[in-house]
Design a protein with these regions (language model features):
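Acidic active-site catalytic centers that drive phospho-/nucleotidyl reactions
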Residues: 15-16, 35, 133, 249
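Glycine-rich phosphate-binding loop of ATP-grasp-fold ATP-dependent ligases
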Residues: 49-54
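PLP-dependent aminotransferase class I/II
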Residues: 1-6, 24, 60-61, 72-273
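Hydrophobic framework residues that shape the active-site pocket
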Residues: 41
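Conserved beta-strand->loop/alpha-helix structural units within folded catalytic cores of enzymes
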Residues: 47-48, 259
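Catalytic PLP-binding core of fold-type I/II PLP enzymes
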Residues: 1-27
Length: 273
């Protein structure tokens, strides 16, 4: 075990929070629940930088100084990273995340432009997955209006919920006393319907200029995973969730008129099934 694993004292809990930026549970923001959380800022997400994401951590000892070097473990991929005296665990993790994301370079582009500071080292043969400054700037601007975007999504979801009550459908619960969703997707399941019947709804909606989606097709149904020997018959719950799911449009560019148009047509088409 590394010193970090020993400090945590158990299996580290990592949260895939790709869709959850802005969500909370029992009063805690999603990034404050697990030890590590990863967020996606892809172009289709609520909060976007066009491409990219973020890794956050929430460690009770994060502000404590690292007493021993994390990298003394020979099996640790970071065994070549030098120790910095007086560094906290948060600072240590941030530094290592930077190294992982930019080919293991120990200086960023700005640091190399300082007078006489051209030289740098490659500490490890790692990855190229850093967010550019340009797209980060998009995120900083969007952050200023994100609260309003979440509120708009909540109102749209409330309207969908009310309008679809008469239908034989189940929708994802976005809000209750214990949790607040980011309102990323509006998922609807057409009870008692097959995938083929649900696809007909998608086609008819498309004929009326309304783009819907499916979230998600199970991996065992994908060609690459079939080649690996996966069979959807072994995953009945995944197929059950997929077989009659349809995702309705939900974005802050939609006007109230757009929303009503989607509702009117969806209710009509589903009622005729």
């Amino acid at each position: 075990k590394t010193d970090l694993q020993k400090m945590i004292g158990r299996v580290a809990i990592c949260c895939d929070a790709a869709h959850a930026f802005g969500a909370s549970r029992k009063g805690k923001m999603v990034g404050a629940i697990a030890d590590f959380s990863s967020f996606s800022f892809h172009a289709v997400k609520n909060f976007t930088t066009a491409e990219g994401g973020a890794l956050t951590w929430n460690l009770p000892f994060g502000k404590e100084k690292v007493v021993k070097n994390l990298d003394k473990c020979d099996e640790n991929a970071f065994s070549g990273v030098p120790e910095i005296e007086g560094e906290t665990w948060n600072e240590n993790l941030y530094r290592k995340a930077q190294l992982l994301s930019l080919h293991g370079q120990n200086k960023d582009a700005l640091a190399k432009t300082k007078l006489g500071a051209w030289e740098y080292d490659i500490i490890g043969t790692w990855y190229k997955c850093n967010m550019t400054d340009v797209v980060a700037a998009i995120g900083l601007v969007q952050m200023q209006r994100y609260k309003g975007m979440l509120e708009r999504r909540r109102k749209m979801i409330a309207r969908y919920d009310e309008a679809l009550k008469p239908l034989n459908v189940v929708v994802l619960n976005h809000y209750d006393e214990e949790h607040i969703s980011s309102g990323h997707l509006y998922l609807v399941r057409l009870l008692g319907k097959t995938r083929e019947e649900t696809n007909k709804v998608i086609e008819k909606m498309a004929e009326r200029g309304i783009a819907t989606n499916v979230h998600y097709k199970p991996l065992p149904m994908m060609t690459a995973y079939k080649k690996l020997g996966f069979d959807i018959k072994d995953f009945p719950n995944a197929f059950h969730m997929f077989e009659n799911e349809i995702t309705l449009p939900l974005n802050t560019k939609m006007t109230d008129e757009d929303l009503e148009y989607v509702i009117e047509n969806f209710v009509e088409i589903v009622s005729e099934l």
